[in-house]
Design a protein with these regions (language model features):
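Iron-associated oxidoreductase/ferritin-like identity signal
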Residues: 3-6, 17-220
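Conserved ASCE/P-loop NTPase catalytic core
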Residues: 9
Length: 220
């Protein structure tokens, strides 16, 4: 009898306003949705909290998108550099997965829910999908070298937005940016010209030089 009374007491406790969510932060179209707890939590409050939530949520989405695209390329890359790219992309996938988990947990630590739903990725990521089917190794290299830069630039905005009000979040985002910049270099180095080798990528691209990477438009 005491057991059921205790369970009832706990149920009543969690039904009180103290355990309710204090609100959501979401865009006009409902994505992403980050519920904010009314319970005491770590991290910043007010505007600083909202800035950190936005920075962490966008970083989470881009890392999840990169998880999907690194696997797509890992499976389907074809050409001379199949094996080294196959292995490298697995390493990159594992790295972005690790940081995605840390970013999501930081959202929870500062009192917000993490939105990692498929629809949220589709609607809010600024990184496009890889093409379907088999993918040429030169295409994989330029795709990742370009889009890692897109993600790094976005993370950089989050670092600046959170550095004054939430240095812990800013420091975490700096770690993530460091990893993404390393991955970008590892791709770019495969077609990086040097004083002794123009390294046009033609040997990977049926004798045709790989078009130079263009810097993506700034993140919105």
């Amino acid at each position: 009898m005491m057991r059921y009374a205790s369970l009832a007491a706990v149920a009543c406790l969690f039904a009180t306003p103290a355990f309710a969510q204090s609100g959501d932060t979401r865009s006009d179209n409902g994505f992403p949705q980050n519920s904010v707890s009314s319970q005491v939590h770590g991290g910043p409050q007010g505007d600083a909290q909202r800035a950190s939530i936005a920075a962490l949520q966008q970083t989470l989405i881009e890392l999840q998108q990169l998880q999907l695209q690194t696997k797509q390329a890992h499976w389907n890359v074809s050409g001379t550099l199949f094996y080294p790219l196959h292995e490298l992309l697995q390493d990159h996938h594992d790295g972005v997965a690790k940081y995605a988990d840390e970013v999501a947990e930081r959202l929870l630590a500062i009192g917000a829910s993490a939105d990692g739903r498929a629809n949220t990725i589709v609607r809010t990521s600024r990184v496009p999908e890889m093409p379907g089917g088999f993918i040429d190794d030169a295409q994989v290299i330029t795709w990742f070298a370009t889009n890692y830069r897109v993600v790094s630039d976005e993370i950089g905005q989050g670092i600046k937005a959170s550095e004054d009000g939430d240095p812990t979040t800013s420091n975490l985002l700096q770690e993530v940016q460091h990893a993404i910049d390393k991955y970008q270099w590892q791709m770019r180095a495969m077609i990086q010209p040097t004083p002794t080798d123009p390294n046009t990528g033609a040997d990977l691209n049926g004798g045709r030089p790989v078009p130079p990477m263009t810097r993506a438009a700034p993140a919105r």
